[in-house]
């Protein structure tokens, strides 16, 4: 039958590779339209073409438990059991992120603990977004590094129960794995080393002689607190700079401003002056008034002639 595992396939974790998927989900995959139309007669070479057509990641969805194409291709790879080199090329493929995700899931299902850590941990540096279809049939966004973290730490991914994975520190103690160094730690080490080099360069530089002279001059001069007048001038200086050239007019306009006062104010001042002069020198004022009212000799002659004519 078309749903049987190939004859030369090796057992994985002591069982048939297809049995890594639960029976209910496996039967749903066999009955799906995608399995019958797209996965029939596929080989290891043709699976690559189908994997390149994937648009999202997911397990089953809906009330009828419909499988996604991603899960169907996973079961097909468990059925035909491609070579390890092909799976490694799937994982190292940087052009198609869904091909990489498919290879990572297959490696997690069939590979040893050492192979899983060796080939999947470098994918932590892949921050590309992938679409994931949940059980309700809705799509969500996820990054590739999140998907890899789920494969290494969770028990179920894409509705498939993952085999038990040995802890990493156990493999490190038995020297089967080297301690993991993340890319972030490497970047931090590079930054720290560059900062230390810059500090050493700054310490090695001698200050310029002008800087020394300036320091000696500052030490010789006694420090004084600025006078209030100096403070005012400094505080007013930016205002003066900001004034327009029209406001910087010289003193003559100010004099014109004093001259152009109201006539009423000028008259009041003249009256005050007259009043003061009256109070200080009354005799002088009277003589002045008498002089102003005394008739001139020509006027006296005219008045005398008029009086004669009247008498005549």
From Swiss-Prot:
UniProt-annotated stretches for the region Disordered: 180-312
Feature: compositional bias, Basic and acidic residues: 202-223
Main location: nucleus
Biased composition (Acidic residues): 184-201
Region (N-terminal protein interaction domain): 1-179
GO biological process terms, semicolon-separated: mRNA splicing, via spliceosome
Subcellular location: Nucleus
Residue spans of biased composition, Basic residues class: 224-294, 301-312
Gene Ontology CC terms: nucleus; precatalytic spliceosome; U2-type precatalytic spliceosome
Keywords associated with the record: mRNA processing, mRNA splicing, Nucleus, Spliceosome
Subunit-structure text: Component of the spliceosome B complex.
Recorded family membership: Belongs to the PRP38 family.
Known function: Involved in pre-mRNA splicing as a component of the spliceosome.
Name of this chain's protein: Pre-mRNA-splicing factor 38A
Organism of origin: Xenopus laevis
GN (gene name): prpf38a
């Amino acid at each position: 039958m078309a749903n049987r595992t190939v004859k030369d396939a090796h057992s994985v974790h002591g069982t048939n590779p297809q049995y890594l998927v639960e029976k209910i989900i496996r039967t749903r995959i066999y009955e799906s339209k995608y399995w019958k139309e797209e996965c029939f007669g596929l080989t290891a070479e043709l699976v690559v073409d189908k994997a390149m057509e994937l648009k999202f990641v997911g397990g089953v969805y809906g009330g009828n438990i419909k499988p996604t194409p991603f899960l169907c291709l996973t079961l097909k790879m468990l059925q035909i059991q491609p070579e390890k080199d092909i799976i490694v090329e799937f994982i190292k493929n940087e052009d198609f992120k869904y091909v990489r995700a498919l290879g990572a899931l297959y490696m997690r299902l069939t590979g040893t603990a050492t192979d899983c850590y060796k080939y999947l941990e470098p994918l932590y540096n892949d921050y590309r977004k992938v679409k994931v279809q949940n059980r309700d049939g809705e799509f969500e966004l996820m990054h590739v590094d999140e998907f890899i973290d789920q494969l290494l730490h969770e028990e179920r991914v894409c509705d498939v129960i993952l085999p038990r994975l040995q802890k990493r520190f156990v493999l490190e103690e038995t020297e089967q794995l080297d301690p993991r160094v993340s890319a972030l730690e490497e970047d931090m080490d590079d930054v720290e080393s560059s900062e230390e080099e810059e500090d050493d360069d700054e310490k090695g530089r001698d200050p310029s002689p002008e800087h020394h002279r300036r320091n000696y001059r500052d030490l010789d001069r006694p420090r004084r607190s600025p006078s209030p007048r100096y403070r005012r001038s400094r505080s007013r200086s930016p205002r003066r700079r900001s004034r327009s050239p029209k406001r910087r007019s010289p003193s003559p306009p100010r004099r014109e401003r004093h001259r152009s006062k109201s006539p009423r104010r000028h008259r009041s001042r003249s009256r005050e002056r007259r009043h003061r002069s009256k109070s200080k020198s009354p005799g002088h004022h009277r003589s002045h008034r008498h002089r102003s009212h005394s008739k001139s000799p020509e006027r006296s002659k005219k008045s005398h002639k008029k009086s004669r004519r009247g008498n005549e």
